């Protein structure tokens, strides 16, 4: 067994009894002890309860019980998600002693599916940066090069996966916080559609908030393979518990089964965000292969530009972020705006 194996592979080994949940947990704890001092990805551990749950998972498997698709899998979650009984800080010093009384909804779903959540991974202050540092736990380093950042804000999540400290993670994303760390650390990350995964129990907002998601933050998995992302989404996606009577996540079967029957639209690029040659070549190769397989492939323009899309994003982002600013900060920003060039069109200034 290698700690670079995918979560899907490890789950199968657990089911085949090639390794026990207790053994797999200890392998990860040993790995954390060996390399985490240099990476600083895992910042909080819950070893005793994790060992108890791992033993229970093994006993259940021996009796033929099935806890779910993640039965016995040890994993960590971003320190933005409340985990009952474990310090959850959101990277904020004012929450350094916060111990939740209940799980965030994503943690509820993971544990209900059989996962063993044994620790938390580092975040920047309020998950608001593209690096990973806070005053409580310090800086997280990229496991491939300790002098480099893993990105942020789910930098601890991505670094832990890349470093062999956990096989699966759940981060959050508003402006790249899953995707950037996944890219920097060479792992897989997915930002799902808005509200596909419940975000209740994420910090911010403040601890204990039970309100529904009114931001543009989404929860998203990080892993070592695309199959693992699908596995995680099969557990995490769906309506909030308060909405389960209102809708369900059941899509109709696809209208076509053969590739030749599909029409595929390709948006090859946009001047606002030019592609690197290697990426453009890969898209063209994929387009050519689809056409060779009989699909009807057409280049299209969606009717809006990435510049328009970027402006809209920053308007939404600024509105969300500013709601949490103290009045003094808002007053200072207004003063800066008065002194700025009126011809500046950047939405981050407006």
Task: Give the label of every model feature segment.
Residues 1-51, 292-294:
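An N-terminal boundary/leader segment
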Residues 21-26, 55, 275-302, 325-337:
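Acyltransferase
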Residues 28, 50, 72, 78, ...:
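Conserved hydrophobic/aromatic pocket- or pore-lining residues that grip, position, or stack substrates
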Residues 48-58, 114-115:
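Long amphipathic alpha-helix in the N-terminal Rossmann-like dinucleotide-binding domain
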Residues 60-135:
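Acidic/His- and Gly-rich active-site-bordering loop/insert found
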Residues 70-90, 258-267, 318-350:
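Short helix-loop capping/hinge segments that flank enzyme active sites or metal/cofactor-binding pockets
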Residues 102-233:
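Short glycine/serine-rich loop segments
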Residues 191-281, 285-287, 304, 331:
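A short helix-breaking turn/cap at a secondary-structure junction
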